[in-house]
Amino acid sequence: MNTIHVDVVSAEESIFSGEARFVALPGEAGELGIYPRHTPLITRIRPGAVRIEKADGTEEFVFVAGGLLEVQPNCVTVLSDTAIRGKDLDEAKATAAKALAEEALKNAKNDIDIAMAQSELAVMAAQIAALRKYRQKK
């Protein structure tokens, strides 16, 4: 069976390292699907869910808050400042953080504050969407 080695790494730790049949993740220009022997690629990724179909057929979900993707024919590396295993996502915390970001956006006084609040809001909305997607797959 053909597999590809996948590493998902955050600033704090390695979130996933193992063999997979397929990886799907949110590329900057749209969803990316990666199989073994994929053409080499380096691109930025958007906040969202990384879905890894492991060699044994089970699936692993990881939320990433954006980052970089490197693909080689036999290796996929996802680098993200923030990456959270699907099972560790907390909807209450994400919803509260989204509400704080919405409030910060309303109270923003300059372009930098607006951009920071919009970025945080996008990440929290993506995290909530990833959590709901993870729950549907369970």
From Swiss-Prot:
InterPro entries: ATP_F1_dsu/esu_C_sf, ATP_synth_F1_dsu/esu, ATP_synth_F1_dsu/esu_N, ATP_synth_F1_esu_C, ATPsynth_dsu/esu_N. Keywords: ATP synthesis, Cell inner membrane, Cell membrane, CF(1), Hydrogen ion transport, Ion transport, Membrane, Transport. GO terms for molecular function: ATP binding; proton-transporting ATP synthase activity, rotational mechanism. Its main location: membrane. It is found in: Cell inner membrane. One of its GO terms (cellular component) is proton-transporting ATP synthase complex. Transmembrane segments: none annotated. It is a peripheral membrane protein. Pfam families: ATP-synt_DE (PF00401), ATP-synt_DE_N (PF02823). Produces ATP from ADP in the presence of a proton gradient across the membrane. F-type ATPases have 2 components, CF(1) - the catalytic core - and CF(0) - the membrane proton channel. CF(1) has five subunits: alpha(3), beta(3), gamma(1), delta(1), epsilon(1). CF(0) has three main subunits: a, b and c. Belongs to the ATPase epsilon chain family. This is ATP synthase epsilon chain. The gene is atpC.
